[in-house]
């Protein structure tokens, strides 16, 4: 399956800012049910960012997508902004960070990872 197949297989993409409690606090079960509903209705394009809930949206989405084959969805994220000052404060054990911040590497976003992905991108069918 090529990227175009994945992008057109669902009705919409799924933006995960609300999963990071952007508008209101969302329990983990509700976040998972929301992503599951999108998946069950054919959505396969997911957009997230480290800034959404100080990483909470990425963590919640990552837990859900880990249950599915990596070739069955497209994951988009943003890079370049870290919240290092918040990680190093006394608040790191507060409600915001109880979900595993500092992040664990699940997908390789390092320079080395990006360089490795370049040949992979060239092999993907865009037709």
PLM features: what roles do these ranges have?
Residues 1-86, 92:
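N-terminal binding-site loop/beta-alpha segment at the start of enzyme catalytic domains
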Residues 23, 91-127:
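Glycine/proline-rich, positively charged
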């Amino acid at each position: 399956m090529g990227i175009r197949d994945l992008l057109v297989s669902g009705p919409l993409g799924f933006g995960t800012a609300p999963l990071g409690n952007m508008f209101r606090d969302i329990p983990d079960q509700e976040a998972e049910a929301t992503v599951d509903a999108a998946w069950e209705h054919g959505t396969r394009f997911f957009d997230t960012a480290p800034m959404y809930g100080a990483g909470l949206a990425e963590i919640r989405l990552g837990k859900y997508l880990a249950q599915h084959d990596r070739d069955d969805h497209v994951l988009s994220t943003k890079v370049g902004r870290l919240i290092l000052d918040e990680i190093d404060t006394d608040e790191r054990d507060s409600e915001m960070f109880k979900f595993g911040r500092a992040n664990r590497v699940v997908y390789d976003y390092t320079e080395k990872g990006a360089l490795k992905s370049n040949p992979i991108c060239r092999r993907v069918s865009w037709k």
